[in-house]
């Protein structure tokens, strides 16, 4: 039996939408626990992933991106991000180093300017709360070292960061070192989850998130951000398999044919991809049935917020 005391704590991951927060959480855990797509603001609520480092359990809170909110859903998501940060033992601010470098040295892509503005918004938010964070420069694998050093120095001098790590969440470069460092910051205490549990997310919500990811991956250039997936039926069958019925909800009638596709081809492809991953995650055969609904006011319905732990009244 090890003489090393057990440790357990919470580490929040904050940053601009699409900075690579979800990819980093998955890399730290070693398994997929949160969805990753081309779309910004994919993570809508705080998802907890559970990473292990020796005798230490790190509960990673993958928060929604911090950005300038416009809708009720936006405001709820940003509030959830700061709530997750405020309750954590340590905070990681993930910055897309490539986007920041392109803004400074030329070759900027669409969305880079907004991402840098959102990063600065996080930095200012940390200043106001007087919380120290770990600066995680992500997507550094294709950047010149001199640019990285200058960038890290500039951000470190804001006074809100205790450490700087340079990583590539996608390739895994620098991730083990970051995991070990975070583990050293966790307080002594009993583990909150069994050793083999990698996520704290109800199965019904996890299933909806998996299908939502497939919707975005299949239709990311055609379907607006304003869509959601709801798990309506979850039935265990006699043979041990699962019957899952879900609705893909969009805001307008004109969006419904996009999700369905010609002859139902798009929704069929989404269903096949989702069913395959659900079977891997749940460890049983899954019978998945998808329906497409139009609900112009889904973002204004309190029940949708409550289901995923967002504050409707923020």
Swiss-Prot record:
GO function terms (MF aspect): GTP binding; GTPase activity; ribosomal small subunit binding; small ribosomal subunit rRNA binding
GO biological processes: ribosomal small subunit assembly
InterPro entries: G_ERA_dom, GTP-bd, GTPase_Era-like, KH_dom-like_a/b, KH_dom_type_2, KH_sf_prok-type, P-loop_NTPase, Small_GTP-bd
Region (G3) residue spans: 62-65
Domain KH type-2: 219-296
SUPFAM superfamilies: P-loop containing nucleoside triphosphate hydrolases, Prokaryotic type KH domain (KH-domain type II)
Keyword presence, GTP-binding: yes
Topological category with respect to the lipid bilayer: Peripheral membrane protein
Chain positions covered by the region annotation G4: 138-141
Record-annotated Era-type G domain positions: 7-188
Region of interest: G5: 167-169
GO cellular component: cytosol; plasma membrane
Quaternary structure and partners: Monomer.
Protein name per the record: GTPase Era
């Amino acid at each position: 039996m090890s003489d090393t005391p057990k440790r357990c704590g919470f580490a929040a991951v904050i940053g601009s939408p699409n900075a690579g927060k979800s990819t980093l959480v998955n890399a730290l855990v070693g398994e997929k626990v949160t969805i990753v797509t081309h779309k910004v603001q994919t993570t809508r609520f705080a998802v907890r992933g559970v990473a292990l480092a020796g005798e230490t359990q790190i509960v990673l809170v993958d928060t929604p991106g911090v950005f300038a909110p416009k809708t009720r859903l936006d405001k709820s998501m940003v509030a959830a991000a700061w709530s997750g940060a405020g309750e954590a033992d340590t905070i990681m601010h993930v910055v897309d180093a490539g986007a920041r470098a392109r803004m400074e040295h030329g070759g900027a892509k669409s969305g880079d300017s907004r991402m840098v503005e959102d990063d600065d918004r996080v930095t200012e938010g940390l200043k106001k709360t007087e919380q120290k964070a770990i600066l995680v420069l992500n997507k550094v694998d294709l950047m010149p070292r001199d640019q990285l050093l200058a960038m890290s120095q500039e951000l470190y001098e804001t006074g809100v960061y205790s450490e700087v790590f340079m990583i590539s969440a996608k390739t895994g470069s620098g991730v083990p070192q970051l995991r070990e460092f975070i583990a050293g910051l966790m307080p002594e205490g009993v583990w909150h989850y069994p050793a083999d549990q990698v996520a704290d997310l109800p199965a019904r919500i996890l299933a909806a998130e998996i299908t939502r990811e497939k919707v975005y991956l299949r239709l990311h250039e055609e379907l607006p951000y304003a869509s959601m997936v709801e798990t309506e039926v979850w039935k265990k069958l006699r043979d041990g398999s699962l019957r899952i019925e879900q609705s893909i909800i969009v805001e307008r009638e004109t969006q419904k044919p996009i999700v369905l596709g010609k002859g139902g081809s798009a929704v069929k492809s989404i269903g096949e991809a989702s069913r395959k991953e659900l079977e891997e995650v749940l460890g049983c055969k899954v019978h998945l049935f998808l329906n497409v609904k139009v609900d112009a006011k889904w973002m204004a319905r309190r029940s949708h917020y409550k289901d995923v732990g967002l504050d409707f009244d923020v």
